[in-house]
Design a protein with these regions (language model features):
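Conserved P-loop NTPase motor module
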Residues: 11-13, 201-281
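Conserved phosphate-binding elements of NTP-dependent enzyme cores
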Residues: 119-121
Length: 282
């Protein structure tokens, strides 16, 4: 799987216990290996054991925005912002104060390359009305993780390029995403594009259903490589369906972040112009 370090916004969604954190961890490991910087907003302490970043905050101590920014000034440091010490009602305000600072750092340095927001429906609820300075329309390198995509602020959902769903009834999560955007649209605006109708999808362990909003294609299933701690080999990304290779893409370009192994039949993904493309290495 290849993630372009700029220009993509991803929604990772699924029911509780479906493997969202596992997939996010696998992606973050590859980002760390390729020296792309990230900042994880971690409301529940789910990433405390992640080895590629420094944790700021704990259940008895809230993190400091200044401390987060001081850490991210160092290009080789990733940050996990643990919000267990911040009251539930105060977390959206904390994040609203942190995001502009992250954007200022990006404007100066281009970093962090990715901002990962777990439990996004709590930090960015539907009632959130950000200003243009808090949430600029050109914001990219954003990964939202949530059980309830329809409970996330529409202004944030509108930035999403690609949806990755796991767990039971994954197509329902995509439907909830599209419905949330439709409810928020102004009169006269065109309807949000929806995925082509397909039969209900049953995913096996390790699989995800992926949909690109702008592709005009139906969602497709893909088996994802697990994190290092859950595999006995370097890992690979296996194609689920041999027909899921998009025309016009036959080689994986240099660069990007590989989430598959080097096996000859390995299928790979790459974000390109907001599209998650399936590529097969030859």
């Amino acid at each position: 799987m290849h993630l372009k370090p700029y220009g993509a916004n991803v929604l990772l969604t699924g029911s509780s216990g479906s493997g969202k954190s596992t997939i996010a961890t696998a992606i973050l490991e590859r980002l760390d290996e390729q020296q792309y910087q990230f900042c994880i907003i971690d409301p529940e302490g789910d990433y405390e054991s992640f080895e590629g970043a420094l944790v700021l905050g704990d259940p008895s101590r809230s993190p400091s925005v200044d401390a987060v920014m001081d850490l991210l000034e160092k290009p080789d440091q990733n940050a996990i912002v643990n919000l267990l010490g911040v009251g539930m009602a105060d977390r959206p305000a904390f994040f609203e104060g942190l995001l502009p600072r992250l954007q200022e750092l990006r404007a100066r340095s281009g970093r962090p390359h990715w901002i990962v927001i777990d439990e996004a429906h709590h930090l960015l609820p539907t009632s959130w009305r950000p200003s243009s300075t808090t949430l600029p329309q050109e914001l990219s390198g954003l990964m939202l993780i949530t059980v309830h995509p329809d409970h996330v602020a529409p202004a944030v959902l509108s930035l999403i390029d690609t949806i990755v769903t796991v767990g039971e009834a994954p197509e329902q999560a995509i439907e909830a995403f599209s419905a949330a955007l439709e409810r928020s649209r102004d009169a006269g605006e065109p309807l949000e594009a929806r995925p082509l109708a397909s039969a209900p999808t049953r995913l096996e362990n390790g699989e995800a259903l992926i949909w690109s909003r702008s592709s005009g294609e139906s969602p497709f299933r893909l088996r994802l490589a697990p994190p290092r701690g859950e595999r006995g080999d370097p890992g690979r990304l296996d194609r689920v369906d041999p027909d899921l290779v998009w025309p016009g893409h036959i080689r994986v370009p240099d660069g990007g972040i590989g989430l598959g192994g080097g096996h000859a039949s390995t299928a790979r993904l790459k974000f390109r112009d907001g599209i998650l493309a399936v590529l097969v290495a030859q």
